[in-house]
Amino acid sequence: MVLPTVAIVGRPNVGKSTLFNRIAGERISIVEDVEGVTRDRIYATGEWLNRQFSLIDTGGIDDVDAPFMEQIKHQAQIAMEEADVIVFVVSGKEGVTDADEYVSKILYRTNTPVILAVNKVDNPEMRNDIYDFYSLGLGDPYPVSSVHGIGTGDVLDAIVENLPVEEAEENDDIIRFSLIGRPNVGKSSLINAILGEDRVIASPVAGTTRDAIDTHFTDADGQEFTMIDTAGMRKSGKIYENTEKYSVMRAMRAIDRSDVVLMVINAEEGIREYDKRIAGFAHEAGKGMIIVVNKWDAIDKDNHTVAKWEADIRDQFQFLTYAPIIFVSALTKQRLNKLPDLIKRISESQNKRIPSAVLNDVIMDAIAINPTPTDKGKRLKIFYATQVSVKPPTFVVFVNEEELMHFSYLRFLENQIRAAFTFEGTPIHLIARKRK
């Protein structure tokens, strides 16, 4: 399901990040907070009144070297392109400023709903001062103290009220995948080469994101695919399009919509920090993964080159031991014909269900190989396990005490399940739960 997007904009020092953190921590529950994947907390997924939405702090995308007005102009432009709802944050302590008026004139031209949040209204006496903000022409101002959590519920109510109608569930028989990677790794060439394969019938269809065009195609076996286009990564003429943080945000949105993510690496440049950050987000989101090394035709090779690359990738992406690696060339089409079948296999792994009886046989065999650990004389007891969901496959292991299930033993059980049932290209989640 594609989540609607809420963007927070405003000049520096009005409390955008504080409001972001207040909303994100207010349960509104954080469903997937990607702090640690991006250096700045610019993106989270939350819920209010049973509606989920993606939350973006556009302040985290600023180019600090750009002129002040250019920075806030870029914020507003990003918000208008990306968001279904915009939260425009101003400061009740400082009143209406020239910068506020500048942003309001930009936002006034958009058809996107704008919610005016007057922050730093930290005591009741200040509420009378918010009426000055009617002059911005953006409707009723909402008094907020993000530091104290006052008024955030009203802002959230307004956000939910203005979110678009929920879309129908997408066809689960269609496999959705995206190609993610830094600029110049050859994503566009790969897309064109994949769609140029003789066994692929392609047609562009309107995407569900604001400006993306997804491509729907069917392979020779009749399997339908949707290739999710990270359009913003390739658009030209926009200064902020080239910033890494903006690219990260675009990649995150594509990952959210994907069943399988193809992490594209440039063989000429090797692995960069950006690659690991984006791959980490896809892993945490439970997506199927393929590591695609492109431009394989462009480097010198010997009998050891593949082995060296595989060893380096496994070392750099230690959390992606399950992800297959494929070396391709968009230029010569080397191994591109293998990608659709590989994507299909990983999608099957994502949707695989294991009968409880068979699963518990594997668990019991694992315990026989490596007995459960003890802590302070008390031994972990595993009663039974069951699979509770797919995409990714998720298992609950019922135990006597959750605290006795050490991370290393949970990882051991995961490895035993993988050895028994393969699960190619997909993370699997194991959760220890006390039996009631």
Curated annotation (Swiss-Prot):
Domain EngA-type G: 4-167, 175-351
Annotated KH-like domain residues: 352-436
Biological processes per GO annotation: ribosome biogenesis
Pfam name, any one: KH_dom-like
Binding sites annotated in the UniProt record for GTP 1: 10-17, 57-61, 119-122
Single annotated GO MF: ribosome binding
Positions that bind GTP 2: 181-188, 229-233, 294-297
Keywords associated with the record: GTP-binding, Nucleotide-binding, Repeat, Ribosome biogenesis
The keyword Repeat is annotated on this UniProt entry: yes
InterPro entries (UniProt xref): G_ENGA, GTP-bd, GTPase_Der, KH_dom-like, KH_dom-like_a/b, P-loop_NTPase, Small_GTP-bd
Protein role: GTPase that plays an essential role in the late steps of ribosome biogenesis.
Subunit structure: Associates with the 50S ribosomal subunit.
Family: Belongs to the TRAFAC class TrmE-Era-EngA-EngB-Septin-like GTPase superfamily. EngA (Der) GTPase family.
Protein name: GTPase Der
Organism whose genome encodes this protein: Streptococcus pyogenes serotype M3 (strain ATCC BAA-595 / MGAS315)
Lineage: Bacteria, Bacillati, Bacillota, Bacilli, Lactobacillales
Encoding gene, per UniProt annotation: der
